[in-house]
């Protein structure tokens, strides 16, 4: 996904001190953010000009103690053509030398009212999500009791119909048919819809329906963390399925592993209710309540008791 300075301005609600349309369309290529330190003393070894440059109270205070000539020289050296933008936090008064250097080097100069640490967090959060490499997977992503559940299976098995039933039961649709997943970090997977398919569900025999129009804004969600994968497969006599819930199957997307549960589908089985139960059971396991372990402990106690009584 291409991220421009203008997108950052709109998302993080930055004020534009100086910029042109061309400068606002400049692409941001990394989510890393620099807070100049040694650079203000004139040391530019290992300086990364392709990053956003963020000036907070400490950087601003150091600049104000410099002479006008030195301040201009340092900022002129710091502002490179590769630099997408310079951001000043806390609504600090921007030195005229900074404005002059930004104009001469063609750098967008932005400001914000919020604190430096909060601003850095907001910008990093937006850039990490926007610049992350995306992988498209086939399935339906639902928010079930606040948990992101990716429903997959062979074509025609009823994924979208199950998603519709879950919406009717009060859960939220994130994406249908194509789910774009990406890793926010090494352990966190997120998913979102393709823009052209946002809020839409395709139901065989009915066609495409707009879930937001039919069921309201509470029935949809723009993105969700993906915490559990459900794989629907046709029930076959003799095929072994996990009946105790002690299987540890996982699937990997974008380098992140998440647990996967296989659910057999047959006529008369209410799949949506089963998926609800699977989501709640997974949440319970994360909280330390494992029904399978409880059963196994009871079984062990019963066997031990019977052996002693014999």
Swiss-Prot record:
Keywords: ATP-binding, Carbohydrate metabolism, Kinase, Magnesium, Metal-binding, Multifunctional enzyme, Nucleotide-binding, Serine/threonine-protein kinase, Transferase
UniProt KW ATP-binding keyword: yes
Region called Important for the catalytic mechanism of both phosphorylation and dephosphorylation, residue ranges: 201-210
UniProt name for this protein: HPr kinase/phosphorylase
GO molecular function terms listed in the Swiss-Prot or TrEMBL record: ATP binding; magnesium ion binding; phosphorelay sensor kinase activity; protein serine/threonine kinase activity; protein serine/threonine/tyrosine kinase activity
Cleavable signal peptide: none
Extra remark: Both phosphorylation and phosphorolysis are carried out by the same active site and suggest a common mechanism for both reactions.
InterPro entries: HPr(Ser)_kin/Pase, Hpr_kin/Pase_C, Hpr_kin/Pase_Hpr_N, P-loop_NTPase, Ser_kin/Pase_Hpr-like_N_sf
Record-linked NCBIfam families: hpr-ser
Pfam families cross-referenced by the UniProt entry: Hpr_kinase_C, Hpr_kinase_N
Subunit organization: Homohexamer.
Reaction equations catalysed: [HPr protein]-L-serine + ATP = [HPr protein]-O-phospho-L-serine + ADP + H(+); [HPr protein]-O-phospho-L-serine + phosphate + H(+) = [HPr protein]-L-serine + diphosphate
Function field: Catalyzes the ATP- as well as the pyrophosphate-dependent phosphorylation of a specific serine residue in HPr, a phosphocarrier protein of the phosphoenolpyruvate-dependent sugar phosphotransferase system (PTS). HprK/P also catalyzes the pyrophosphate-producing, inorganic phosphate-dependent dephosphorylation (phosphorolysis) of seryl-phosphorylated HPr (P-Ser-HPr).
Region: Important for the catalytic mechanism of dephosphorylation, residue numbers: 264-269
Record: residues binding ATP: 153-160
Free-text comment about domains: The Walker A ATP-binding motif also binds Pi and PPi.
GO process annotations (BP): regulation of carbohydrate metabolic process
Active site per the UniProt annotation: 138, 159, 177, 243
Species per Swiss-Prot/TrEMBL record: Streptococcus pyogenes serotype M1
The organism's taxonomic lineage, starting at the top: Bacteria, Bacillati, Bacillota, Bacilli, Lactobacillales
Entry's EC annotation: 2.7.11.-, 2.7.4.-
Disulfide bonds: none
Co-factor(s): Mg(2+)
Recorded coiled-coil stretches: none
Binding site for Mg(2+): 160, 202
EC category: transferase
